[in-house]
């Protein structure tokens, strides 16, 4: 049954924090507060945003987004989702949830602004391999991700170009550099960018895995990113997310103009695998358009090429 898009007046949401109602958090976690929805200002810009999103939501109703997974895998995902303590996260997969909204934060239309509401976004990044089983109109998909997008945006705001091949999460850790250690550095950096109160710390078991104290890790991060040190500790995260939401809107509408559906997962996009190369081109162009500097991408292949061990270049060449 084809859905009717949500009315435009419900698509742009502005939230703020109720500072009198802090949420309970574990020690050394970022402080959180109850969120309240406030009135979205009626301006030409918010009307434009709503019109653009309504157009995307109307387009997505013409397509079928599904999971090509056995029931046992769906049960595993459902159990993981049911245990999520965040009340703003889905507790189960509802395949009818394909209508998106843009949510802004801190009562400011220039902070945050990412797209939410699609069921595919509820698949935790730790379970990313399940997203390789998402299909669009029965076709296999791939996911193209911006690499270290928020850090690259901060550098761009300072007018500094970064080599697309440079790993911004490599901070010179002692010992062998591994994917698991890189993920912890990424978690730390992304957290401090959204932690104005400077209360965040990785858990003790995570710090032991890195072989560092919180202070030693922070010192390495700030030394590695000395040109943007002040921005990192000032909690610039919501500002960078607004810029990446502008980039996302541009990508979504560009692909709609081409008759191609992309599914946003904040700073990555899912598309039919035959459109991978086109999406990569559009993503790099949009990043340059909004930042003035080159971006960097990472692509997750569909499950079949992964199974046969194809390299990304080999897989791309299958379509040439």
What are these regions (language model features)?
Residues 1-130, 139, 296-320:
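Non-catalytic nucleic-acid-binding interfaces of large nucleic-acid enzymes and RNP effectors
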Residues 150-156, 273-282:
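A short acidic (Asp/Glu
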Residues 165-176, 266, 293-304:
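A generic structural motif
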Residues 196-201, 276-320:
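C-terminal polymerase-core module
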Residues 246-265:
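Active-site palm subdomain of RNA-directed nucleic acid polymerases
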């Amino acid at each position: 049954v084809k859905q009717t898009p949500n009315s435009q007046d419900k698509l742009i949401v502005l939230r703020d924090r109720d500072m009198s109602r802090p949420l309970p958090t574990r020690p050394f976690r970022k402080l959180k507060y109850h969120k309240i929805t406030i009135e979205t200002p009626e301006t030409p810009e918010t009307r434009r945003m709503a019109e653009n999103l309504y157009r995307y939501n109307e387009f997505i109703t013409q397509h079928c987004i599904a999971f090509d997974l056995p029931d046992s895998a769906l049960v595993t995902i459902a159990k993981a989702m049911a245990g999520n303590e965040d009340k703003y996260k889905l507790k189960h997969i509802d395949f009818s949830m394909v209508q998106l909204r843009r949510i802004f934060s801190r009562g400011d239309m220039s902070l945050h602004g990412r797209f939410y509401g699609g069921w595919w976004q509820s698949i935790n990044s730790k379970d990313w391999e399940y997203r390789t089983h998402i299909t669009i109109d029965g076709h296999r998909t791939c996911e193209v991700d911006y690499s270290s997008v928020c850090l690259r945006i901060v550098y761009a705001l300072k007018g500094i170009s970064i080599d697309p091949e440079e790993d911004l999460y490599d901070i010179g850790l002692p010992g062998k550099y591994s994917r698991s250690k890189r993920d912890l550095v990424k978690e730390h950096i992304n957290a401090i960018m959204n932690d104005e109160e400077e209360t965040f710390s990785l858990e003790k078991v995570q710090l032991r895995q890195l072989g560092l104290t919180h202070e030693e890790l922070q010192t390495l991060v700030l030394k590695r990113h000395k040109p943007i040190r002040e921005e990192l500790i000032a909690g610039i995260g919501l500002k960078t997310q607004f810029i990446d939401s502008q980039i996302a809107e541009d990508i979504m509408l560009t692909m709609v103009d081409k008759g191609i559906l992309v599914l946003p997962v904040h700073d990555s996009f899912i598309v039919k695998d035959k459109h991978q190369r086109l999406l990569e081109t559009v993503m790099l162009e949009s990043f340059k358009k909004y930042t003035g500097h080159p971006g960097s991408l990472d692509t997750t292949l569909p499950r079949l090429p992964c199974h046969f061990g194809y390299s990304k270049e080999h897989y791309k060449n299958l379509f040439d």
